[in-house]
Swiss-Prot record:
Keyword Plastid: yes
Function of the protein: With S4 and S12 plays an important role in translational accuracy.
Protein name: Small ribosomal subunit protein uS5c
Coiled-coil residues: none
Organism of derivation: Gracilaria tenuistipitata var. liui
InterPro entries: Ribosomal_Su5_D2-typ_SF (IPR020568), Ribosomal_uS5 (IPR000851), Ribosomal_uS5_bac-type (IPR005712), Ribosomal_uS5_C (IPR005324), Ribosomal_uS5_N (IPR013810), Ribosomal_uS5_N_CS (IPR018192), Ribsml_uS5_D2-typ_fold_subgr (IPR014721)
Ranges of residues in domain S5 DRBM: 15-78
GO aspect biological process, one term: translation
Pfam family, one: Ribosomal_S5
Main location: plastid
Single GO MF descriptor: structural constituent of ribosome
Comment on protein domains: The N-terminal domain interacts with the head of the 30S subunit; the C-terminal domain interacts with the body and contacts protein S4. The interaction surface between S4 and S5 is involved in control of translational fidelity.
Amino acid sequence: MKKKSIKDKEQENNWEEKVVQVKRVTKVVKGGKKLSFRAILIVGNEKGEIGVGIGKASDVIGAVKKGVTDAKKHIINVPLTKSYSIPHPIEGISGAAKVILRPSAIGSGVIAGGSTRTVLELAGVKNILAKQLRSSNTLNNARAVLNALSQLRTFQNTAQNRDINIERLFNM
């Protein structure tokens, strides 16, 4: 049986990539300043899989390519409800950035700003309320959302952790 390559997996999952930020950064060396680019990318398949990555290179295209490979290395699965929302409210922290995510009613849409909105849309979340607190840093806010989404638990996970069946969980 043939082993699946990375390109086969890419075509299978239909990954969508979005560049959130491209920044010119400099490094001071003996001969002067060395210029390079840093790209922050978000990769998702809109079916509950999402990843955030960073790429640095001397040109923008190289930085974007490195960012895509980095994002695909850090992919997490997000449990979504039937209404394409999250199962319960949650908070995520990365650095100084704090993000609060709350499930929302059908038809309310993605109410979020900046990189938080991009992460949630590429994850496949369609109804959610989000608020960024304490920091406006693009990278830390994206990572805070990823941190929050990775902490989400379904009813089945909770029931298994407590060693009870789902019906008993609802009767409590």
